[in-house]
Amino acid sequence: MIRLILIRHALTNDNKKGRLSGHINSCISEEGKLQINKITRYLSNENIDKVYTTPSTRTKDTVEKISKLKLLEIEEKEALREISFGDFEGRTFEEIKIKYPNEFEKMIKEGNNYRYPNGESLIDSYKRVAEEIDNIILENNSNLDTKTILICSHAGTIRNIITHLISGSYKYHWNFKIDNASITVLEIDGGFAVIDKMNFTDFI
């Protein structure tokens, strides 16, 4: 069995301003730094076997302390990145609505099929995340004992992982709320996934 601990990175300055930061870096805020300490304390008694993040500094910074505490190397996975917002990286939806009204209208109309200029659609991001999480599960699967895998990633990525593991599609993507520094836990046995914790933040 695999116990999958999914952590959304701690609060960033861009998060506070409502700015889209898919593939660009955004610094952890002062509040986020406190969240990191609380995440580390909460997970200190967990038996963690592997730690994965994305190349984004906000994910690596979030779990650096717990990784060192557990004497584990962080393994970066490019495919677990947030959706690429392309030309709209660093902007707010309000800015997009005002400066690019036609594109904003197209975004609303096309929904999950909408592809950001020079970026991705939700479906694009779902496909790469689904393939990567399947590979991670296959690499770490063991019939003999339970392995605990920690992944620190992004809200969109975590939604993609959950909807993929419970339904095999992206259709429930928007049904899950994923807060900054939240912990979601899934147990996967024989290809069947059960949600043990969902968007858990009581420790913060």
PLM region spans:
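Short glycine/proline- and acidic residue-enriched helix-loop micro-motifs
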Residues: 103-124
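Active-site-adjacent alpha-helix immediately C-terminal to a catalytic or transition-state-stabilizing loop
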Residues: 60, 131-194
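Short, solvent-exposed aromatic-acidic interface loops
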Residues: 196-204
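General small-molecule cofactor/ligand-binding pocket signal
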Residues: 5, 75-77, 196
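Loop-to-helix element that buttresses phosphate recognition and phosphoryl-transfer chemistry
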Residues: 11-62, 117-129
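Extreme N-terminal starter segment of soluble prokaryotic enzymes
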Residues: 1-5, 50
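Phosphate-coordination/substrate-recognition cap region in phosphate-metabolizing enzymes
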Residues: 39-104
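Active-site metal-binding loops of divalent metal-dependent hydrolases
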Residues: 10, 155, 201
